[in-house]
Amino acid sequence: MPANSAKEAERPPTWKVLVLATRPNTLAASFTPVLVGFAVASRELGALDPAPAFRFWVFACLIQIGTNLHNDYADFVKGADTDDRVGQARATQKGWLSPGQTAGLSTAALVAAASIGASLARRPGCGGWMTFVTITSVFNALAYTGGPFPLGYVGLGNVSIGYSGLGDVFVFAYFGLVATLAPYYLALEAGAPRALFGLLLTAGVYASG
């Protein structure tokens, strides 16, 4: 059986392909730090409206999904994901999604995240820092292993956040500091050292990477 036919024969249902492409096993790293930040704020202030924290959680999940999809796309077009790859299935490498489809899904997730980030930035006292978080989160999602165009195609080889040794730094900053402190800032407009316990989730992201 030709390779393409074999890949098509083993293709899961479309809904399952889409779920697998988002790497749902990694998404706890978006949920838990947000929960910790909101819990600390609630402990210090009492009853709080959970809506801003929930919206930020959706924002964080969409950023992570967009990052995962773009990583799937970039690793495939740059030749990092081949048929010899060992580990969790990658939708583009398996031929379940075309590179264009994966990139399009990544773009959709990041646009949705940016729209939520923009709405959170309109909250009193949140405009500057939330705008910064939104813009840099989208940039990091695209630059983690590829950038908006495969960097190997523009003469930069494998220079990217993930392949340059900076990946852990950005994971620490955004899945640790930002994801934990943002819900707290949205509720209190001030930071708290105890919220930094959410940084422990960074270890989980390292392991999944």
For each feature predicted by the language model, list its residue ranges.
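Short hydrophobic alpha-helical membrane-anchoring segments
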Residues: F38, S42, I65-D72, T145-G146, ...
